From Swiss-Prot:
GO terms for molecular function: formyltetrahydrofolate deformylase activity. It comes from the Bacteria. The gene is purU. This is Formyltetrahydrofolate deformylase. HAMAP family: PurU. GO terms for biological process: 'de novo' IMP biosynthetic process; one-carbon metabolic process. Residues 7-90 form the ACT domain. InterPro entries: ACT-like_dom_sf, ACT_dom, Formyl-FH4-Hydrolase_C, Formyl_transf_N, Formyl_transf_N_sf, PurU, PurU_ACT. Its EC number is 3.5.1.10. CDD domains: ACT_F4HF-DF, FMT_core_Formyl-FH4-Hydrolase_C. Pathway: Purine metabolism; IMP biosynthesis via de novo pathway; formate from 10-formyl-5,6,7,8-tetrahydrofolate: step 1/1. Keywords: Hydrolase, One-carbon metabolism, Purine biosynthesis. The active site is at D228. It comes from Synechocystis sp. (strain ATCC 27184 / PCC 6803 / Kazusa). It catalyses: (6R)-10-formyltetrahydrofolate + H2O = (6S)-5,6,7,8-tetrahydrofolate + formate + H(+).
Amino acid sequence: MQNLTATLLVSCPDQPGIVAQIAQFIYQNQGNIIHADQHTDFSSGLFLNRVEWQLDNFRLSRPELLSAWSQLAEQLQATWQIHFSDQLPRLALWVSKQDHCLLDILWRWRSGELRCEIPLIISNHPDLKSIADQFGIDFHCLPITKENKLAQETAELALLKQYQIDLVVLAKYLQILTTDFVVQFPNIINIHHSFLPAFPGANPYHRAHERGVKIIGATAHYATAQLDEGPIIEQDVVRVSHRDNVDDLIRKGRDLERVVLARAVRLHLQHRILVYDNRTVVFA
């Protein structure tokens, strides 16, 4: 059984002594720090920190910890989160008709590689219901048209609330979410089938082939109101040549999409990402 830990993510205006204050807060309450990482963005004057400590002998209860830390955070003018290792995030997978990212995430989850709960799959097509059934996950098909999009998004938000979802993963969900939806539920990771900012939008492999590119890539990012412009979490590339046709590019691209999305989801579940100024610091 793993030791129970707490993970603090914090960002605040940079100033001397922040690390010492955080470490002292944990030490004086009998916490043992096991991981700590930090970054200072000098251009924005921002300090960013991730620290994880054992709770075995910690003298504060969780409500007391949150209350005590909030007082110090207020002094630091900090934005912060605290996560506990025994509270597994609840994840919803959204898909359309392509199954490669869905199957990869589900396999990693079943094997224990991704520490989370996956109680819900949402799709705008019925095609992948058999996969949900195979894994014992509830499947809800909500077809999207121009006329019913807002009503269906209301239904989707209700499902996220019903299933107490913490994170939505767009595992090749080929619908554009409205600004209102993203504002109401901002914890969304998308996999984009190109190395952003190159070739945003549809058919990137066809456009990449037409341009004769020498590498193709995949990008996992948080979804925002601006299409394919959210904070980037993870990226990767693979070399291609003039001998590769569009099908070759699609095949290689799908391999990248699987791996890049899985990395991004794992980083989020491990609370290793801080977002600021539409970009991320990843404490990998």
